[in-house]
C-alpha cells in the first residue's frame, strides 16, 4: 500500500502545535517511519484498526504525546524507567520513546507477534531505549525484576479503571506515576475506582481533558501517584482481577 507520509506529517505537526508541544524534525521523521511500518505490516498482521494517515497521526501519535503537557511529570527524575502496559501496536510507548530518548521503555503485551513487530521496527529505527516484555501484567507485577521498578507506568485502552489500576500499581515505584489514557467515560470510571485507589496506595494527582483536532473525539488523561509500598497480595491471579475488580 502507499502511505501518505505528507498527510500524516502535516496532520501531526498541526496537532502538536495546537497542543503546545515542540518536537524535533528528527523525531517527526522517526514517527513518520513508524507509522508507515504499521500501515504496511497491518496488511498481513492485525496491529491496529487505525491506518488512515490523518487518523493515525491524531488518535495514536498525538494522543500518546499529550502526557508531555503535564506538570506532574516534572517531579520525576530526568532519566526515567518506564513501562507501557498492554502496548498493542506500540502506543503510547513508541512515540514517547522517540521524543524522549532519555526515557528507557519496556513495552509489555501478551501478544508476541505485535511485540516482534515493535522490537524489529525499533531496531531498524535505532531506538535503543525500547525493549519488549511478553507477559501478562498480573505475572510481571509479581516478578522481582519488575515489581515497583518503574518511575512511570502508562496504559491506553486496556481495561476499566479499577482493573487497570490493579495491573499497574505493582509495577510502579513508590513516588512514581501511573498514567491512564481514557476517553469520555473517565468520570464514571474514576467514581468506580475509589476503593482501588485506597487499596493500591494510589492518589489521584490530575485529570487532564482535551478535544482531539478534526473532531476526532475527547480524551482524558488520569495521573495517579504511588504513595506507599503495595501489599504483597496484589496483583491477584490472572482472571481474578477482572472477575472481582476492586469496586
Question: PLM features: residue spans?
Answer:
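Class I SAM-dependent transferase core
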Residues: 1-79, 83, 113-130
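Conserved SAM/SAH cofactor-binding pocket of Class I
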Residues: 65-166
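Helix-to-beta-strand junctions that scaffold the AdoMet/dcAdoMet cofactor pocket
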Residues: 100, 172-174
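Short alpha-helix immediately C-terminal to the canonical SAM-binding loop
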Residues: 114-116, 186, 190
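Short "lid" loop at the C-terminus of a central beta-strand within the Rossmann-like core
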Residues: 138, 160, 183-187, 212
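SAM/dcSAM-binding transferase cores
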Residues: 191-247
Amino acid at each position: 500500500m502507499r502511505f501518505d507520509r505528507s498527510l500524516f506529517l502535516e496532520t501531526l505537526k498541526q496537532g502538536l502545535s495546537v497542543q503546545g508541544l515542540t518536537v524535533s524534525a528528527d523525531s517527526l521523521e522517526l514517527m513518520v517511519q513508524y507509522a508507515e511500518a504499521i500501515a504496511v505490516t497491518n496488511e498481513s498482521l492485525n496491529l491496529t484498526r487505525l491506518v488512515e494517515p490523518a487518523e493515525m497521526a491524531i488518535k495514536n501519535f498525538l494522543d500518546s504525546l499529550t502526557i508531555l503537557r503535564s506538570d506532574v511529570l516534572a517531579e520525576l527524575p530526568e532519566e526515567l524507567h518506564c513501562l507501557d502496559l498492554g502496548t498493542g501496536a506500540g502506543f503510547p510507548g513508541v512515540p514517547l520513546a522517540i521524543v524522549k530518548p532519555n526515557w528507557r521503555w519496556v513495552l509489555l503485551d501478551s501478544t508476541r507477534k505485535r511485540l516482534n513487530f515493535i522490537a524489529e521496527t525499533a531496531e531498524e529505527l535505532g531506538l535503543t531505549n525500547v525493549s519488549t516484555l511478553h507477559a501478562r501484567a498480573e505475572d510481571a507485577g509479581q516478578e522481582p525484576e519488575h515489581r515497583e521498578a518503574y518511575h512511570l507506568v502508562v496504559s491506553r485502552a486496556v481495561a476499566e479503571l479499577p482493573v487497570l489500576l490493579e495491573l499497574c500499581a505493582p509495577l510502579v515505584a513508590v513516588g512514581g506515576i501511573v498514567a491512564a489514557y481514557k476517553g469520555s467515560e473517565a468520570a464514571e470510571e474514576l467514581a468506580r475506582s475509589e476503593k482501588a485507589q485506597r487499596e493500591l496506595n494510589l492518589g489521584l494527582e490530575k485529570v487532564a481533558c482535551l478535544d482531539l483536532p478534526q473532531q476526532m473525539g475527547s480524551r482524558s488523561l488520569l495521573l495517579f501517584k504511588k504513595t506507599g509500598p503495595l501489599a504483597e497480595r496484589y496483583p491477584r491471579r490472572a482472571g481474578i482481577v477482572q472477575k472481582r475488580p476492586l469496586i
